[in-house]
């Protein structure tokens, strides 16, 4: 789930829990990525049922197979907890969002490592129109146009990062 926050008062309230990073209030769109907690992935949940129905094209036999494969994955192959896996899934979305923004000239700044408890409490108290039940904060991204030219990034040499196996 994505919360796109342009309300300046809410951004001001969230800023202290993000170590007062100026991007929080300077950006035009502060996007919070919410991950799903374990209850969404319990066998028979309406979320899973709807998801599996979409994947199976509303074919009941195919839906049963998809359900069995996913439940086996949850039981046997999933190394972190379901909640941690859900957070990792949000990183895929965030990478795509940031790449898409860059491709059209919009800057972005990922925000993590903040005080998650304080941040989440502030979100819940400041946004009445969303039911936060069953969600956790995964990550946040500031989107907008930079005011000043960015300093040159220091990158590792490609050979220090990539090993080719032929």
Language-model features: locations:
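Acidic, surface-exposed loops and disordered segments
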Residues: 1-166
């Amino acid at each position: 789930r994505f919360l796109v926050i342009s309300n300046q008062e809410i951004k001001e309230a969230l800023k202290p829990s993000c170590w007062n990073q100026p991007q929080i209030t300077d950006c035009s769109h502060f996007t919070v990525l919410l991950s799903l907690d374990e209850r969404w992935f319990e066998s028979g949940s309406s979320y899973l049922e709807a998801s599996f129905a979409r994947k199976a094209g509303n074919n009941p036999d195919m839906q049963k197979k998809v359900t069995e494969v996913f439940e086996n994955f949850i039981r046997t192959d999933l190394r972190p907890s379901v909640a941690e896996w859900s957070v990792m899934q949000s990183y895929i979305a965030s990478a795509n969002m940031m790449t898409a923004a860059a491709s059209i000239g919009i800057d972005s700044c990922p925000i993590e490592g903040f005080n998650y408890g304080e941040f989440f409490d502030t979100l819940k108290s400041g946004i009445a129109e969303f039911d936060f039940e069953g969600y956790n904060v995964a990550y946040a991204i500031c989107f907008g146009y930079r005011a000043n030219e960015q300093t040159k990034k220091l990158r590792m040499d490609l050979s220090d990062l990539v090993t080719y196996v032929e």
